[in-house]
Amino acid sequence: MCRCGPVILIALGANLVSPAGPPADTLKRALARLEALGVKILSVSSFYETRAWPDPSDPPFVNAVAAVQTTLQPVELLDLLHGVETEFGRMRSAPNAPRTLDIDLIDHDGSVMGGAVTLPHPRAAQRSFVLVPLAEIAPGWRHPVLGQGVGELLAALPNKGTPKKLA
């Protein structure tokens, strides 16, 4: 049971079938697994389809962002997230490779850290597949280093394909 703690933002994505099924089912089951492990799910964005990058011929990704709470410290939480990825068949073969599940720690209550965990996530401000669902559940979020709001960050992105909300 969660004793809770600060509000934390995580991003989830998948573009390969996992033991849980197709990508959207994988995200749902991964969120349920996190909850079973004591991570309180506060809110979850809609699911979005995003073209794969850097190879758009790879299957498209399904992406979402969730606001969660846990008493785990960032390093402990990242270890837990990586464990859940592994449970769902994640293989770390190459950067940006297709994957059954990817869970990124985006923000841990506004903390700024380097080392074993970099917070906020170093590329979150450049990723529409993070910012679009993030804007849906946390429209007032501000990047702890850049000081910009999620809307400002989205407006600054080059148009590389906007994520499409899934029904």
Predicted regions and their residues:
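Flexible, gly/pro- and Lys/Arg-enriched active-site loops
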Residues: W53-P60, L78, H82-A167
